[in-house]
């Protein structure tokens, strides 16, 4: 095997390993975000794919899909709560989430709350 063929083989293996690692990380992050939704009582008002009291996570993702400030807006809404974005029923504040968890959670919502099954 010549040098370039061997290098190409190693490059392809490294690329495949990187893609697999990203997939595993995304699945782990999705599971953690789903657990945060459950632990913080978000699922009392929200579901992944249907409106309960508040909008579904998928509806939120769709509404803000093209908004570059969506992540900051959602983080603020989760931390401070409020009303007016989706109706008259106010969302309670949830100020106990860490910055890291808040970033993970809002990212998951904006991706449409992918399933961890």
Predicted feature descriptions by range:
Residues 11-21:
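Bacterial N-terminal signal peptides
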């Amino acid at each position: 095997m010549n040098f370039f063929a061997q290098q190409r083989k190693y490059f392809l293996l490294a690329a495949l390993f990187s893609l697999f690692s990203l997939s595993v990380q995304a699945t782990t992050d999705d599971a953690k975000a789903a657990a945060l939704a459950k632990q913080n009582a978000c699922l009392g008002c929200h579901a992944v794919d249907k409106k309960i009291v508040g909008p579904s996570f998928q509806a939120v993702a769709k509404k803000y899909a093209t908004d570059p400030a969506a992540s900051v807006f959602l983080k603020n809404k989760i931390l401070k709560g409020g009303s007016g974005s989706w109706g008259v029923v106010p969302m309670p504040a949830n100020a106990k989430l860490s910055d890291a968890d808040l970033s993970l959670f809002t990212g998951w919502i904006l991706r449409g709350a992918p399933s961890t099954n």
